[in-house]
Structure formats: structure tokens, C-alpha cells
């Protein structure tokens, strides 16, 4: 049969076009971005990604969390936000009158979260968006979907601020189904990071994770040790080894919420300085706990009891007991297998995993928070949500107490890793030299504390910070600067509650900085004292500080012969109609072995020598004067 030359020519042309297309796409994919900034991938925590249910026509319907307006509509109240709406409903109907409507509302809200006995989803649930190309800041903005970004305007680092630094097309938010086993989601993260690199023309990305998102990131690092997609990894208030809060909610024991902590966390989340203590005048603690316990056990747990991620987040001390009372070894065998893969994997090898990443060249950083009891009632040093020991591996004194005077650092690291208030020993931490601790700061809430926010941004976007001992602005142990902390006292030489000494007779500074942290109210400082008299503060009369204003207060005192602990107490009052007299304590340590940078370290050596000589001369003259006084007394 005679061949048609036209067909042959057409085939050659088509083949050539296809070949050129392949070369063009390969060249495009191989084009490297020379912007000088790694793309950033952000991983949020529990409940942050909006979940949706696939409909028969292929569309997605938002199911959790439901829109606030929908909840308020179900509540039957007109209010600007959910908290105000619930308070309004309580005021209208009282605790007895809201049981039925609340039961119906809560049940309908949590039902889409239901999972089967084997830990798979009962409904066809997926994140509301997925894929790198759909979850960049550029895509969120272009598609008018910024309201779908987790933690919009709260807690998380701000995507838009990062976008201003490195470009909207270089900032991504990994959305995921936070109910699933972290090992399963780690596989999705593995693919997602590869997508981001291909999309942006970069070999590596910087990853910022918070809370449960940090457990996911750690699990990914453990499950995919040969991946090389990451250059920097920041763990912000991470849930790494579990949390008593999750265990407290899953246990069969009565719930005993700490409402002071709960309300303070709520203030921080809402970024408000409003005092919510009036809520407890409406609902006594016992009544509120009974309501919460009843609601949790009868309305929430039936839908969420088989969620693998929750079981993976239980603390290690209570996991086996809670498993024995809540799960069936046969019926839930596959669920338990999923859970224990993660618990026996990354969660049992946290330090090894992080150091393996560091060995590959990844800059790993941890920011943890302390000084707050858990909201769920367990009395342990925490950020309100995650225990310190499970967040960063630290050993802590019993909550409300300090280590005894004869306590020695648990591990010799070559650094002083005991906090100045002697409540935290970070020497046992998962990675102590790359861990920063913020005292009295609540879980997440990066945007609510300017110094914490700045630290996280520097760790994520730069290599400026060598370790937790190398930067004067970011000492390893910091005090919260959030507005709801009211006031802070910091030694001028360290920006912390450590007071190093220069010699046997000389402190590294002779003043503290006292700052009003409120963004809107004046405060009156009436007194500053040290409990054991180590320091005497020069405050002869009360001072008034405007919102955000600082004052330098001088002190005198004799340098203790050995390392010494004391406590500064500030008496103050917010100058508002409802302002009350209040105090805030700051535990501090006078030490000769401070491991961080002091302002003295940044001062030229000849000036330090001159200061020491001047002090020695003053000391000699004082002794001579004392001798002459003694002689004159004999005469």
C-alpha cells in the first residue's frame, strides 16, 4: 500500500511540537529562582484548617468549623462574635435553659468529625483547599480567599508580612486534615514540599510550624529522613511528646478546667486587654465544670473518640490508661496500630530526629512558653495548652514552686540552662542550644508579643542567630511582653531576669527597665521590692507610665558570695475605672555563670577595665574611711 507523504509530514510536525513542548516545560521547571530567599511553608495546628465534605456533584461544603454567623443563627442571638453570643445566651436563659439548644448545636458541629473504629473518616472530608498552587499567599489573595488562611489575624506569623519580605508567590500554607494520623499527613507534606520547590524554582524551603503542626513536621522528618527540602525549621510552642490537656479531655475522670488560664488564653487569642473575670460571676467554677464535663462526655466524645491525631497527642504517662478505658483492642486494632506507629516513632525519638536534621544542615529552632498551668486543670508548668516537658523536653519544678537551693542542673551542657526564676531546667531539652523559653506567654500568640514575633521572624528568614546564647535581644529565657501581662521588669544588662556579676563586688548593671505593656491604659507603679533584700530600688514615690512607656529604675545592693535567687515584686494599678491594685513577681538569679550575651560583652574592654578600677578605688577609699572612723572612735 502506498504511504501518504502528507500523513508522514504531519506526524513529524506533531512529534516536533510535542518534543519542543517537553523541552520547554523541562527548561521552565529547571529554571532556578535567584531571589535569594527560600520559600516559606507554614503549618498550622489543631482545628485551624477548614474541613469540607465532598458533595455528590463534586463540590465542597464547609463543615468544620462552621461559619460564626451560622453558629450565632443556631444560637438565636444577635452578637458581633461567638464569645459575646454565648455570654448573651447565658444571660438570657441561664445555665438550665441552654442545655437543649447547646446539645443540638454542639452535636451538629462535631458530627462531621466522626471517624470509624479503624481511624478512617466516616464522612468524605477533605481540607477546603489543597495543593501548593492553590495555597500560596498569591493564590489566596488572587481568589479572595484570605479568610480561609488558618489563624488569620491571630496566633500565627502573618503570611502577608512574610510576603512583603520574600514575595506573595513564595509564601505557602499547608492545609491538612488535622484528624488523621500524623504519619499519613506526613506523606502529604512530603509531596507538598516537592510541589513548592518545583513551583518556585528553589531546592529548599523554610518551614514554620505551630502546636500540632510541629508534631506533624517532626513526624515528617522522622518518616522521610532522606528528604532534603528544608533549610530552616521553626517549632513554635510545639506539641512534640504529647499534652496533658488532650489526655484530660479523653479520660473518664471528671473535667476540672482552670478558668483563670482559659479566660487569659481567650484574651490573648482575641488580642484584647478586657478583663473577662466577670464571666465567673455569671457561671461559678463548679457549675461551669459540670456543664463542660457533661457537654464533652455526652456531646463531643462520641464523634471524636476515634480521631487518630488526638490519640497521638495524649501525654505518654496517661496514654495506656486512657486507651484501656476508651478503646477496644480488637475493634480499634487498626486505629491503635496507626497511633502507635507515631508514638513509637518520632515521639520516642525527638532529639535524635532533630539533631539528624541539624547534621544535614537544617537550622532547627524551638520556642516554648512556661509559667502557666494547663487550661484543662492539670497543675503543671505549661503554656496553657502543652506541658513544658512535652513541648521542649525541659525538667520543671512543681508548678508554683522553684527548684530547691541545692538543685544542680540535670545535664552538663557547658551552659547555664536553669531559668532565672528557677522553675525550668532546659539542659534536658530536645535541643537546648536552639531553644528559647518565654515566661508567662500563652500557647502560640506570636503576634501578641513583639519580641517573640521578631525572634520567630529572624529564625525563619535569616541565619543571624547562631544559638540561644548569642543575641542580646533574644536571651534564652525571656519574659512575655504581651499587653495582657501588664508590666515587665528586665535587668538592663541582659534584657532578662538574669543579673550577672563582673566581680565579687560589682553587678553587670545598676538598674532595671520597667515597662507598661498595655497598648491603651496608663499604669501607676507604687513600689518595687526584692523579697530577700538582695536589691534596693530607688523609687521614693509612685510613677505613672503611659501605654507602652518604660522607665529606668536604679538599684543598689551587695553582690552575694554565691549564686543567689530572689524575687522582685512590682505593685501597680491600671489607671482605669475598673482598675484594681495588683502585683507581679519576677524571679531573678544573680550569677557569675551567665551563658548569654550582656551589654558589657558589647562594651570595649578598656571601658570595662576602667569601671572595675574605679569601683576598686572606691572600695579601697571606703575601707580607709572605715579605718579612720574606727581610730577616731578609739580616741
Outline where the language-model segments fall.
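Terminal low-complexity/disordered tails
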Residues: 28-36, 43-51, 294-507, 520-521, ...
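Short, hydrophobic/aromatic beta-strand segments
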Residues: 520-528
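Short, solvent-exposed loop/linker segments at beta-strand-coil boundaries, enriched for Pro/Gly
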Residues: 529-541
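Hydrophobic core
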Residues: 14-22
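Terminal connector regions
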Residues: 562-598
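Asparagine-centered strand-capping/turn motif at beta-strand->loop junctions
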Residues: 514-519
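N-terminal non-catalytic accessory region
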Residues: 30-208, 214-269, 383-486, 600-609
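Short, solvent-exposed loop/turn segments enriched in Ser/Thr/Gly
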Residues: 504-512, 551-552, 560-571
Amino acid at each position: 500500500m502506498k504511504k501518504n507523504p502528507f500523513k508522514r509530514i504531519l506526524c513529524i510536525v506533531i512529534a516536533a511540537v510535542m518534543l519542543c513542548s517537553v523541552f520547554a516545560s523541562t527548561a521552565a521547571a529547571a529554571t532556578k529562582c535567584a531571589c535569594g530567599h527560600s520559600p516559606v511553608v507554614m503549618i498550622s495546628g489543631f482545628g485551624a484548617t477548614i474541613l469540607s465534605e465532598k458533595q455528590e456533584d463534586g463540590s465542597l461544603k464547609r463543615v468544620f468549623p462552621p461559619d460564626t454567623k451560622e453558629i450565632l443563627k443556631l444560637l438565636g442571638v444577635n452578637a458581633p462574635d461567638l464569645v459575646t453570643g454565648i455570654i448573651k445566651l447565658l444571660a438570657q436563659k441561664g445555665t438550665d435553659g441552654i442545655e437543649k439548644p447547646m446539645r443540638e448545636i454542639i452535636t451538629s458541629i462535631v458530627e462531621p468529625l466522626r471517624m470509624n473504629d479503624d481511624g478512617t473518616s466516616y464522612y468524605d472530608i477533605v481540607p477546603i483547599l489543597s495543593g501548593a498552587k492553590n495555597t500560596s499567599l498569591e493564590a489566596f489573595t488572587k481568589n479572595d480567599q484570605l479568610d480561609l488562611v488558618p489563624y488569620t489575624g491571630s496566633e500565627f506569623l502573618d503570611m502577608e508580612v512574610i510576603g512583603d519580605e520574600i514575595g506573595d508567590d513564595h509564601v505557602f500554607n499547608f492545609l491538612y486534615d488535622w484528624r488523621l494520623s500524623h504519619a499519613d499527613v506526613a506523606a502529604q507534606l512530603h509531596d507538598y514540599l516537592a510541589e513548592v520547590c518545583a513551583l518556585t524554582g528553589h531546592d529548599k524551603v523554610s518551614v514554620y510550624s505551630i502546636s500540632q503542626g510541629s508534631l506533624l513536621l517532626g513526624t515528617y522528618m522522622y518518616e522521610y529522613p532522606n528528604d532534603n527540602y528544608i533549610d530552616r525549621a521553626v517549632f513554635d510552642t510545639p506539641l512534640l511528646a504529647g499534652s496533658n490537656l488532650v489526655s484530660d479531655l479523653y479520660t473518664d475522670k471528671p473535667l476540672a478546667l482552670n478558668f483563670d488560664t482559659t479566660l487569659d488564653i481567650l484574651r490573648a487569642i482575641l488580642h484584647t486587654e478586657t478583663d473577662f473575670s466577670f464571666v465567673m460571676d455569671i457561671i461559678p467554677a463548679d457549675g461551669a465544670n459540670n456543664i463542660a464535663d457533661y457537654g464533652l462526655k455526652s456531646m463531643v466524645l462520641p464523634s471524636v473518640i476515634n480521631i487518630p491525631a488526638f490519640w497521638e497527642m495524649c501525654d505518654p504517662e496517661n496514654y495506656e490508661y486512657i486507651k484501656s478505658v476508651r478503646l477496644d483492642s480488637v475493634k480499634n486494632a487498626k486505629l491503635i496500630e496507626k497511633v502507635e506507629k507515631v508514638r513509637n516513632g518520632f515521639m520516642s525519638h525527638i532529639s535524635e530526629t532533630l539533631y539528624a536534621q541539624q547534621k544535614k544542615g537544617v537550622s532547627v529552632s524551638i520556642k516554648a512558653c512556661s509559667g502557666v498551668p494547663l487550661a484543662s486543670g492539670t497543675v503543671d508548668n505549661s503554656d496553657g495548652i502543652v506541658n513544658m516537658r512535652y513541648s521542649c523536653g525541659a525538667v520543671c519544678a512543681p508548678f508554683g514552686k522553684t527548684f530547691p537551693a541545692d538543685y544542680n542542673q540535670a545535664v552538663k551542657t557547658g551552659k547555664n540552662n536553669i531559668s532565672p526564676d528557677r522553675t525550668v531546667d532546659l539542659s534536658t531539652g530536645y535541643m537546648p542550644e536552639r531553644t528559647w523559653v518565654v515566661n508567662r506567654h500563652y500557647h502560640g500568640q506570636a503576634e501578641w508579643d513583639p519580641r517573640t514575633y521578631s525572634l520567630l521572624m529572624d529564625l525563619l528568614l535569616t541565619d543571624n542567630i547562631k544559638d540561644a546564647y548569642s543575641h542580646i535581644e533574644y536571651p534564652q529565657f525571656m519574659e512575655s511582653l504581651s499587653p495582657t501581662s501588664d508590666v515587665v521588669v528586665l535587668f538592663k544588662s541582659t534584657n532578662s531576669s538574669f543579673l550577672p556579676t563582673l566581680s565579687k563586688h560589682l553587678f553587670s548593671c545598676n538598674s532595671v527597665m520597667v515597662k507598661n505593656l498595655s497598648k491603651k491604659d496608663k499604669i501607676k507603679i507604687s513600689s518595687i521590692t526584692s523579697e530577700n533584700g538582695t536589691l534596693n530600688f530607688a523609687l521614693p514615690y509612685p510613677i505613672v507610665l503611659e501605654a507602652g512607656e518604660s522607665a529606668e529604675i536604679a538599684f543598689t545592693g551587695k553582690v552575694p558570695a554565691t549564686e543567689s535567687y530572689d524575687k522582685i515584686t512590682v505593685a501597680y494599678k491600671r489607671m482605669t475605672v475598673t482598675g484594681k491594685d495588683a502585683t507581679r513577681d519576677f524571679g531573678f538569679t544573680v550569677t557569675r555563670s551567665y551563658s548569654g550575651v550582656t551589654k558589657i560583652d558589647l562594651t570595649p574592654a578598656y571601658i570595662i577595665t576602667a569601671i572595675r578600677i574605679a569601683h576598686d578605688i572606691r572600695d579601697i577609699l571606703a575601707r580607709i574611711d572605715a579605718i579612720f572612723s574606727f581610730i577616731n572612735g578609739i580616741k
